[in-house]
Amino acid sequence: MNTNLSFSAPSQVETDCLAVVVLDHSEKDKPAAIVESADTAVRDAAKDVIATGEVTGKAFETTLLHRPAGIRAKRLLLLGGGKAKTFSAAELLKLAGAAVRTLKSKSIRAFAFALPENGVATGIDGNDGVRAIVEGAFVGNFDPDYYKSDRKDQKIDALTIVAKGDQKALEDALQTGRIVGESQNFTRDLVNEPSNRMTPTMLGERARKMAAEVGLKCEVHGADKLKELKMGAFWGVAQGSDEPPALIILRYEPEGATKDVHLGLVGKGITFDTGGISIKPADGMEKMKYDMAGGATMIGAMRAIALLKPKVRVTAIILATENMPSGKAQKPGDVQIAMSGKSIEIINTDAEGRLVLADGLCYARQLGCTHLVDAATLTGAVVVALGYVNVGLFANDDQMYERFAKANKRAGENMWRLPLDDDYKENIKSSIADIVNAGPRHGGAINAAMFLKEFAEDTPWIHLDIAGTAWMEENKPWIAKGPSGVALRSLVEFVKGWAS
């Protein structure tokens, strides 16, 4: 999708469709839907339909007007943004996605989006607004139906954002939004692939190809490297599959980088999870191709980081394998020795994600990473706790948490911190080894995080459990059913924050 800026008045932009935001300014029983544009001609074009009460400004309400009077656009799309008092850049991002999904369903290929009141009335900074619109448009333009034989390629080809302000700053915001939006869709593309096509080897190849395109260093290692590094926890999972595992390492090492900060991103890359010997129910197992979403998120984040060029070192480690039942597979009751030397009693082979992450966190520390973030579709328990709305966030360091929380707020993604009290450590004690890989059902997401904490040790660390948010269970106005690319925007903001 081509993206560009226009500094003309919205009414003077020649386009197939002009999209504008309508916000609900009502108080008590007084309805007041207002078009958020300083352009009188645009407001006049919408005033009659607003006067009927048909347009209220309700969130994601869409009204398409044909041949609107007084403006050059062939159509005018009125996008309801909800209550004016709570409207934010995060809501604007979703509205841009909704605009794209609405218009491409009508075979419209190009449109313009007017920045709400040019960033004044809504209190949204113009640069943040431009970036939100671009990112949201890319999110809305993604469709997961690659393998349909009768697939119709309905995509928006061109987006013009109508804005006012400092041209250089707005162009920088546009470019940032484009990089992040494309990288989020790159992640979604990886996650969307079926597991017979997205094997650990193929994930490594896709990472290697991307790295060559954007200037990252990339290494992809197989089983011999795992054994050399004594990654017993990772290999314990990988040994049950005929598909070879892949240890994927991406390095971003810019000149002039801060010397005392080296960020480590660790991603779970289980390209298909049957549960192993502790096999999952058949119902819904097809979704387990998504179990590499954490790893894909880290690969996509590294793409964005390489293109945005922050002055901070970043290393990503993705631990890719299948979790399969076979005569070679690990069994409940086995004991594995992790890279750190800790012994792990295997209680449930379906608690495999924490095993691969354990060795990934240890390896990141060995490579000199000073601060760690991992992402994984780790537990069903986090879905019970937070539903399909919030990412479960854990941290062993309050300063690290505060820094990440600020980045997350800028990114506009829903995350919620959960506890890591020492009392929970009782849940991962083993009678024959240092720890177990699966504790009791109660506090399941916390138990998994407590397990990982053992391998982060004293290094400041964030754990993101994206099990409930890595894919959309149904179509939303702004995003298609399927992989979401969640957490990528927050990770990019987090990395940028260290360089500023």
Where in this protein do the model-derived segments appear?
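Short amphipathic alpha-helical segment within the helicase RecA-like ATPase core
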Residues: 1-269
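A generic structural signal for tightly packed, nonpolar segments enriched in small/aliphatic residues
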Residues: 55, 204-500
